[in-house]
């Protein structure tokens, strides 16, 4: 059986040095990159380890493949909100697509603007690994069982993550219609060349996502200890919390979150640790970060196309493109508490401007003067606490919600008056704390979508702040707006006519 290889455009083009346009419609190209059948390519656990390496590499991408967590997942998740904006006076055009929202047809969504290609590469590679691991045909299946089972479980977690991300980007929020609308195509095994799957419903996608996560967690094969760059049991559970929150399943989200908080070795960064701990070389770095993309050298980075380079001030000591800054509204919100240590995770523009405020996000700080070597955080314990607080509130336990939120607040500000009680805690207060904590981590728009909030970047010239002039549809929008969902790249529709397009603009 040939392996599903949804490497389409950029992967094929990089390998074959041919034009991008010639590679656009190969959604179900079945030949593996080396042209070898799975049965021949993966003989033992060492071969499986190589596939595992390729699986994690697909999550990261490279300088030509940035349409997942290499860059675009963060840009999509934050640039569509109100806390982050494009720096239009000096940015290099890497983060403006979802800021201006000027796209009109599926032709506008390409490998550089649409989160589609690389998540399916992740799924394809996960399928390949899982099939081999569970085939029973590996020559060292007995003696290497623990290792094989671990890799199998990791692949299921990453397959779930990729399908989850695709579903929440291209499908309506589950809470809108309980998942009855269209999600994305599901592939849980290598496909034959004649197979062209249609879009499953959002509910069916979540069923597959939850099954993968449950199977991986219940396998007892995932380690509890931290290995930088790889998922473990607690990272899988943190992703599970994110899934339950997106579905509005508060009791489930709270139960898993409390398990992580009580039983894992991860702890919140303290105020004295917070700023320095973002550096991967800091002793406290792994205290709170549960899963991150690991950058080891210039052969496995995203170079100047990665998210860290977009966040770095173009005129700073460790320069980047400077495409992304926080908005004035966000700055107002954060600086309203001068004692909040999160003020210091932002850097002022070296060239001045912005009322001399700090605007550049420094959550991926330079390593030896170069931001390209920074690791990229994907799952943190802070998010688990914030989700637990929100879930507890939604489940009716305001006392527990207040205690959980205060765990965050007390570790971020020395101003005790900012703490909450069961009598004054509100959902809005939880949401504000979430925005302050997770800015730049690609979460804001997904929170907007799942909660049915409205994004208001500005209303008129008087509150425009540092924004460029935006169209009305880019100034204020919600999940019912016509551009709430992106269009599926036209090349994918052409390659697989069974994929139904999202409503046009």
Where do the PLM segments sit?
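Short, surface-exposed recognition loops and adjoining beta-strand edges that mediate ligand/DNA contacts
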Residues: 38-39, 66-87, 166, 171-180, ...
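Conserved, well-structured interaction surfaces
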Residues: 92-170, 218-222, 371-376, 395, ...
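Membrane-proximal, proline-rich intrinsically disordered regions
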Residues: 23-78, 311, 315, 321, ...
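Extended ligand-binding clefts on enzyme/binding-domain cores
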Residues: 45, 52, 60-61, 204, ...
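Sec-dependent bacterial lipoprotein signal peptides
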Residues: 1-22
